[in-house]
Amino acid sequence: MIDVNKFESMQIGLASPDKIRMWSYGEVKKPETINYRTLKPEKDGLFDERIFGPTKDYECACGKYKRIRYKGIVCDRCGVEVTKSKVRRERMGHIELAAPVTHIWYFKGIPSRMGLVLDMSPRSLEEIIYFASYVVVDPGDTPLEKKQLLTEREYRAKLDEYGNRFVAKIGGEAIQALLQSVDLEKEANLLKEELKEASGQKRTRAVRRLDIIEAFIKSGNHPDWMVMDAIPVMPPDLRPMVQLDGGRFATSDLKHLYRRVINRNNRLKRLLDLNAPGIIVQNEKRMLQEAVDALIDNGRRGRPVAGPGNRPLKSLSHMLKGKQEGFRQNLLGKRVDYSGRSVIDVGPSLKMNQMGLPVPMAMELFKPFIMKELVSRNLASNIKNAKRKIDRKDEEVYDVLEDVIKEHPVLLNRAPTLHRLGIQAFEPVLVSGKAMRLHPLACEAYNADFDGDQMAIHVPLSNEAQAEARLLMLAAHHILAPKDGKPVVTPSQDMVIGNYWLTMERAESVGEGMIFNDLDEVKLALQNGYVSIHTRIGVRASSMPEKPFTDQQRQQILITTAGKMLFNDILPKDFVYLNAPTNEKLVNGTPDEYFLEAGEDIHEQLNQRPLLSPFKSGFLSDVIAEVYKQYKVTETSLLLDRMKDLGFYRSTLSGLTVGIADITNLPDKPAIIAAAHKKVATVTKQFRRGLITDDERYERVIGIWNDAKDEIQQRLMDTFDPQNPIFMMSDSGARGNISNFTQLAGMRGLMAAPNGKIMELPILSNFREGLSVLEMFISTHGARKGMTDTALKTANSGYLTRRLVDVAQDVIVREKDCGTDRGLLITAIAEGNEMIEPLYDRILGRYTMKSVINPETGKVIVGQNEMIDERSAQEIIDAGIQEVTIRSAFTCNTAHGVCEKCYGRNMATGDRVEVGEAVGTVAAQSIGEPGTQLTMRNFHTGGVAGNADITQGLPRIQEIVEARNPKGPAEISEVTGVVESIEEDPAEGTKEVTVKGETDSRTYSLPITARMKVAEGDYIHRGAPLNEGSIDPKKLIKVRDVLSTENYLLSEIQK
């Protein structure tokens, strides 16, 4: 037999009866399994040692031959070969069937393979196979036709009429005879002839039949092998009987299914020997057919065979299907040694590439390493002794453990692993307790928090694995997210509020206008209370020689605050001095406006200057990205740790708290609400008089309340004290946003009903005042829907990611340059007035197809085939260029992948992508990972009649990726030309849109409720949508070309 442990790939095919018998080591004749007293396998049964091999290594069944020296001998008493018991995992048996039986996969699969080969409907096949109708196999010289079905009564009548001049059969034998009579070559030729004329359904069927028939010719399989004379029996160790405590046995379902087949087969043999009446034999044959069906695929036809407790039995097919099956559970996803899992806790004192490992876990995970080290240090005489020492928890074991885990990275993983940042490597540090400690900045990549999350830990054993973990997977390397190249390790929550508080400016605080020599003096003054963190002070610029100030600035006094000096102290020495949170300061240095000439009056200047805003979360992220770009990994991870420590320390010192008094009342609120009530009354009056429809009234009411809420929100924003802790939290990006705030202090606003429609009744109260009973009840709908949506969408999103990875995993960067001469013209993606993705983001990190030239100066900004970096991308935008031709994966010529130039920058490193990078998987994960955040709702536009629901969120992504026919499709024009007329036909409920092209004109009929995207007299191109909705990509490909369809899909997904 083949070596079952070494294989490259698998394929499912047909086995001939001879092949099945060749595989087999003997025939299983009895349904018995093991003897209930001796627990030894029964002879000729499903566990027979003569067929499948010995149950104990190198020992025959009767015990005459024991030990390895008799290897290969077949015992003369019991007939068992003396060999390893492992052969029971690979030796098959077989069952000789007393009547041929069809294979359910080939009869029931879609499309039915048997039906296609025989050109018969599955319906009639079923009647033949399950003994409801006879089929004419050979009409002889009678007027009957081949493959004609006859009922029992018709068959008897024809027998009386024609005698044995024709042959008709029933059951598996009939199908076998028909399949044996198929001449494949002749059928194929006939079909090819037919394809020349046929069209429509006939053609489709002919193509399908030709496919199957040519496949049979090519593979050399015979169609009649779809009917089985013998069936293989799976090796017994793959369907074992396990003894439970209490002497009972747990058996595999296959045992029951095989037993049913063997029992019915033996009964059929006996009936045939007895020459039993035909009807009894037929019934037994049908039962055998059903038993074999159940064994191969239980439940595919009729009711599944159930075991104890009415549970359907798991058949052979079920063992290959789904998540729990053989492939995904055992072959592709094995459990691994040297792994553990535990609850995680925050480790604020850890470095970027460290994790805290509890001592008991470390002891267990690194046991072999500790044992080896104990022996090599002569602290233990042998391995057994070393093991005993570990179990006794001797003192010296801990010293060894400390040394063993040094420089030995471990992998941490948190389920669900949605993208490659879900597994990262850290260096372990021993901690007390039983919880693992995770670095606070690693949380975002894992999407972890400390409310009881658990994580798994794995120890890479070999030197290669350790090296790979250290070089490629260390958490310090994963600073940018592979999906968009933005930092994934930005400080959050406490760290943000700490840095925000630190960089605030406050007018007229203690010591305002003092001038200092250098940072040390500032620190001293801070300690002694001469200045506060937020005091605006002056510092000699020359005290910071490394900073990139201009020569003129170096002579001057820099106006800043003590807090900002502390913040700048954590940045690299020669990095720009940050005084205000704006991006151009990051790139272009500190502006002159923050400097004073030596003799100027600082107090006068300070009175004129506005207060600068503090550093928010987004700005911190930009700082990190900029530092990463200039200084790469090491410096960035050091900066991150310093920023984390500073943030935690300062947020503690700030003493930021939230009390009920921080939620302010809005005096204007009653007036705004009264005005809204008045407007609603007016609208209702108009409706009562019949001036507007009910839908219009609903729309307007919703609009009125939304406006009222927005106005309250705006007033709240205006009246806020910048020192208000809640405002600081939301403004800095630490926690919460403005709408939380409006709900606390303004009004909650409109809520959605369970069906997703917005209710007209707004919640006027806020949480500070408290909700009335009715308001409380209304607002619970939304909360419940949110919970159910989240649960459903996780599963859907995970499945989508899996399918995406499946199709994209072989897209790899294969070469440096494919030399294509095609590219893509890129513009910003916008929908109406809303910018979805600006041009800057789309061209950054891509290679140009043609040189980009400044239209005014004629200067070449980027040459041909060069990468567009941040600086040149900004230049292109500043020059007012709206579109750029770039290299794209859509137009890449590389076979089975893409080339470096067409792909562009590797987002995770900010450098060129390297050959061998698995960009397909990265792309699939980047779409799949945010999938969980997308909504499940099919968006209902506030009830305007006829704007068919346009699908959005996760369902829309699935629709696009699978090229389904979209819901609420948009009609597209097939010609380029002018929209001649748009006529409504109320009787038919349609709109007729006529587009006049250069050569011909086309008329499209749309539902009368459709929202138009074109008006009469518009000039449109082919493929342009006429009404709002989603374009069907299959139509677009017919009208335009592949490239424009790819572009459309791309822009849709980006939304």
UniProtKB/Swiss-Prot annotation:
For this protein, the record's SUPFAM superfamilies field holds: beta and beta-prime subunits of DNA dependent RNA-polymerase (SSF64484)
What PANTHER family does its record include? DNA-DIRECTED RNA POLYMERASE, DNA-DIRECTED RNA POLYMERASE SUBUNIT BETA
Q: Which reaction does it catalyse?
A: RNA(n) + a ribonucleoside 5'-triphosphate = RNA(n+1) + diphosphate
Q: Which GO terms describe its biological process?
A: DNA-templated transcription
Protein species of origin: Pediococcus acidilactici
Sorted keywords for this record are: DNA-directed RNA polymerase, Magnesium, Metal-binding, Nucleotidyltransferase, Transcription, Transferase, Zinc
Q: Kindly list the positions annotated as binding Zn(2+) 2.
A: 818, 892, 899, 902
Q: What is this protein called?
A: DNA-directed RNA polymerase subunit beta'
Cofactor field:
Mg(2+); Zn(2+)
Q: Which InterPro entries match?
A: DNA-dir_RpoC_beta_prime, DNA-dir_RpoC_beta_prime_bact, RNA_pol_asu, RNA_pol_N, RNA_pol_Rpb1_1, RNA_pol_Rpb1_3, RNA_pol_Rpb1_3_sf, RNA_pol_Rpb1_4
What superkingdom does the record give?
Answer: Bacteria
Assembly and oligomerization:
The RNAP catalytic core consists of 2 alpha, 1 beta, 1 beta' and 1 omega subunit. When a sigma factor is associated with the core the holoenzyme is formed, which can initiate transcription.
A single Gene Ontology CC annotation of this entry is: DNA-directed RNA polymerase complex
Q: Which family does it belong to?
A: Belongs to the RNA polymerase beta' chain family.
Which residues bind Mg(2+) per the record? 449, 451, 453
Write out the GO MF terms.
DNA binding; DNA-directed RNA polymerase activity; metal ion binding
| Enzyme Commission number(s) of this protein | 2.7.7.6
Q: Per its database record, what is this protein's job? A: DNA-dependent RNA polymerase catalyzes the transcription of DNA into RNA using the four ribonucleoside triphosphates as substrates.
Name the positions where Zn(2+) 1 binds.
60, 62, 75, 78
